[in-house]
Amino acid sequence: MSSTVLVINSGSSSLKFQLVEPVAGMSRAAGIVERIGERSSPVADHAQALHRAFKMLAEDGIDLQTCGLVAVGHRVVHGGTEFHQPTLLDDTVIGKLEELSALAPLHNPPAVLGIKVARRLLANVAHVAVFDTAFFHDLPPAAATYAIDRDVADRWHIRRYGFHGTSHQYVSERAAAFLGRPLDGLNQIVLHLGNGASASAIARGRPVETSMGLTPLEGLVMGTRSGDLDPGVISYLWRTARMGVEDIESMLNHRSGMLGLAGERDFRRLRLVIETGDRSAQLAYEVFIHRLRKYLGAYLAVLGHTDVVSFTAGIGENDAAVRRDALAGLQGLGIALDQDRNLGPGHGARRISSDDSPIAVLVVPTNEELAIARDCLRVLGGRRA
């Protein structure tokens, strides 16, 4: 029987799970438990959510006691300065993760809660934390450093950490494999465009820039997050609108981005609203594309020479119009999109640039769960079935 890894992604009100065979590169089952802790929900907490996940797996004919389970992999958003490799979880590590909650108050606490519950319910297998920030741990100092008082930054560990690292690393490796070229011989730009969105510049397999910063709030316009913002807006709202820090943080994370501009964060529904002539929806889309093009142009300059641009995640993989508009008029910079390829259906990695485009443009489906599962096997010493 092949070894399997259960990958868990615990959010504040949801728990996603997937049972993966990392050697074969296949998913055995996947699901999500939502509305955890909501007043009208039958799922009161993460313990009940995990029990429900086990029940859903059982309904698919999967018994975690007999399916070859060797590890549980937990996605943890923020690893701070200490955690930059997949890490075997124990009480000491969990305590350190709890200390990092100040850096990621919206993301790390539910992940730690999910870890505690899973370790209690699946006590006989290894539990491994895989960090969103790990891939960007060694960003060049010029890219990682904020231009603020150095003593303050050092004392409070303020730097650009970057997120979606598991996805950016996976996609860059898949792009190299698709092109049949060594990873350390390519300069790449990866555009991870989903409800959360980020960009990265990767030189010869090593990240040299990324759009997210101390938190996942910086960078591109997202479904509900503002992305880049003048810090003066925060103090202005505090002084003049009498908004508290928590209120401002909640607005920037949950009521901004596409939702704040157009009242809609789902791009499929946004397009329907645009077709009705809604000017707010049209503006929201234009702001999103403008910010994306700005980062793309910046990263072309950072890399100097770029070999490939890859689109991934829900919007990047499925929205041909976003890809078209993001790359429009960039022939002079070496990017020539093939419109038929861009519009055509496809499964797996595929090229959407013309054959003579100096920079290859790809669509590469991400698979963070598979990447996390493989990281778990590496932590366990490359255990195989």
From Swiss-Prot:
Its EC number is 2.7.2.1. It catalyses: acetate + ATP = acetyl phosphate + ADP. The active site is at D132. Pfam families: Acetate_kinase (PF00871). NCBIfam families: ackA. PANTHER family: ACETATE KINASE, ACETATE KINASE-RELATED. This is Acetate kinase. It comes from Mycobacterium bovis (strain ATCC BAA-935 / AF2122/97).
